[in-house]
A protein has these predicted regions:
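Cyclophilin-like peptidyl-prolyl cis-trans isomerases
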Residues: 1-207
């Protein structure tokens, strides 16, 4: 579902890349972010020496506990990742807004990935689809596609606004109390960096 992201994470973990790296950005009721050896939020690279492409599938979402790639735009994944800590279930009204936002995010992705000689045509096509959705509502096909994710967000919460923007490649299955504890530490209001370092001791990979 997200093979390159999984390969990157396991590959770096096996080398000890993440050992001692701090969580440099922590926002309660949102997420905790790490993976940057410089601790600034501006460093890090993948096992391939640069960035790698996004990987999105309908079944992988930013639910509470999701392990996702941090990035600075399309196909800019390096070494940084975050764990979704938000656990506020979405409401029916939220769901309507998020389903529309997911559609916008997907259309924007089509625009971003369009070859230069097709960019204008793709932009116009995306704008036409968007205008249609604004006037007539989302298609039943899209609503059916989104329904499992909507139901899950209603149950466990998460950050649905990040779907189709950040690659999800893992899920915390136990130990969310540790994530919650990290999210609750005091931070600098300017950059959300913990006032006292919170670091990864090591990441163990079980083959």
């Amino acid at each position: 579902l997200a093979p390159k992201a999984v390969e990157y994470f396991i590959g770096l973990a096996k080398t000890g890349y993440f050992d001692g790296i701090m969580f440099h950005r922590v926002i309660q009721d949102f997420m905790i972010q790490g993976g940057d050896p410089t601790g600034t939020g501006r460093g890090g690279e993948s096992i391939w020496g640069g960035s790698f492409e996004d990987e999105f599938t309908p079944g992988l979402r930013n639910f509470r506990g999701a392990l996702s790639m941090a990035n600075s735009g399309t196909h800019t994944n390096g070494s940084q990742f975050f764990i979704v800590q938000c656990g506020t279930p979405i409401t029916d009204n939220d769901a309507m807004a998020y389903q529309f936002q997911w559609t916008v995010n997907k259309l924007q992705r089509e625009i971003d990935l369009a070859p230069a000689d097709q960019a204008q045509a793709v932009l116009e096509q995306a704008q036409g689809k968007l205008n249609g959705y604004q006037q007539n509502g989302l298609s039943q096909e899209l609503l059916d596609e989104y329904q499992p994710a909507v139901q899950r967000y209603k149950e466990v919460g998460g950050t649905p606004n990040l779907d189709y923007k950040h690659t999800v490649f893992g899920q915390v299955t136990e130990g969310m109390e540790v994530v919650d504890a990290i999210a609750a530490v005091a931070t600098d209001p300017q950059d959300n960096k913990p006032l006292e370092d919170v670091s990864i001791i090591t990441i163990q990979v079980n083959d």
